[in-house]
Amino acid sequence: MRSTAIHFRTLMLGAATALWLAGTAQAAEVHVMISGGLSAAYNALVPEYERTTGNKVITAYGPSMGTTVNAIPVRLERGEPADVLILVGYALDDLIKQGKAVADSKVDLVNSKIGVAVKSGSPKPDISSSDALKRALLAAKTIAYSDSASGVYISTEMFNKLGITAEMKDKARKIPATPVAEIVARGEAEIGMQQISELKPVHGIDIVGPLPDDLQKVTVFSAGIAKGSKEPEAGKALIKFLASPAARETIVNAGLEPIVGGAK
């Protein structure tokens, strides 16, 4: 019975995908640049898009912002090929203003919350309120946060809201070009904070939970077509699929909240 149900869901996903991707008859090579927040769900969904359309997807990963070698703005500046850009919404807005992405192609895909993680088997601190999180951060010897959107918020706003900016100066560090969860899993930080969707795929950690509501920063991840794309129609079809009901279950399982009607 279980295998029958799984087979049925697979058939339904394929059928739904075919409907959403109707009109992409000729195979294409689609270059995608994507930041970490949506990567796990995207990686799970791309094979279905490729199978249904015959298109081949070539993916480059990197932060939505910053100056590291893999950051999406840096990749674009180097002239790397791109058809689809998937990153933090306001970072995509910046690329649109710079003439590097097509303005009317923007689609908001998901909302993403920040979570807290510890090494597997370690005691889970109380983070049920802002005061509890403050105590946990002050008690921790080492703290890690990302070099992308969540880390910018944590280091420039959240610590200040909690009144612990000075105390965090020597114990909290920004992690460039590496998932924060990997640092926590290796025991190099007692507490890690990053998008829940970026924490979930990493083994060796336990997710304590999301930040308290009064400290939470929900990040919108959006997709758009890169200016100068060689395959804009195939790129639009991929974005349409990622925003479709066929992708919803995979996105939710990755710790994200799909945005309905995200087209701008």
Model-predicted segments: where are they?
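Bacterial N-terminal signal peptides that target proteins for export
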Residues: M1-L13
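Bacterial N-terminal signal peptides
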Residues: T10-A22
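Exported/periplasmic ABC-transporter solute-binding proteins
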Residues: A27-N70, V74-P81, Y90-Q98, A103, ...
